[in-house]
A protein has these predicted regions:
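Nucleotidyltransferase catalytic core that binds NTPs
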Residues: 1-115
């Protein structure tokens, strides 16, 4: 369980499925604050979103077993717009991952899982 009073990084996505790129993003985010909230968008199930929240959560927890206590996973609505005002008290950062990680295709991973 994370401490709600401590600085926390936030990751928002579908995580369909959680893969090496997501893992690296998590680890880089964790370096920033020491704890991360992982928000799973509640998207309609289709070919691009074949996994329900509980399955996504289980896959993430399995991948992050070494980081237990440093993250929480929550289900959120299908957020499509992120709006903010002055940004008082928080940073908005893009974490640039290596090109080989950026080239990971969740679509290809889903196709391989279906074969």
């Amino acid at each position: 369980m994370i401490d709600s009073n401590k600085p926390t990084a936030m990751m928002l996505g579908r995580w369909q499925p959680w893969h090496q790129g997501h893992q690296m993003l998590f680890e880089k985010s964790l370096e920033k604050t020491g704890q991360v909230i992982i928000m799973v968008r509640d998207t309609p199930r289709d070919d691009s979103n074949p996994f329900g929240f509980e399955e996504v959560k289980a896959r993430i927890e399995k991948a992050l077993v070494d980081f237990t206590g440093k993250f929480n996973i929550i289900k959120v609505p299908n957020i499509t717009n992120i709006c903010y005002g002055r940004g008082v008290g928080y940073k908005i950062e893009e974490i640039i991952l290596p090109q080989q990680i950026q080239e990971i295709s969740a679509t290809k991973i889903r196709e391989e899982l279906n074969d």
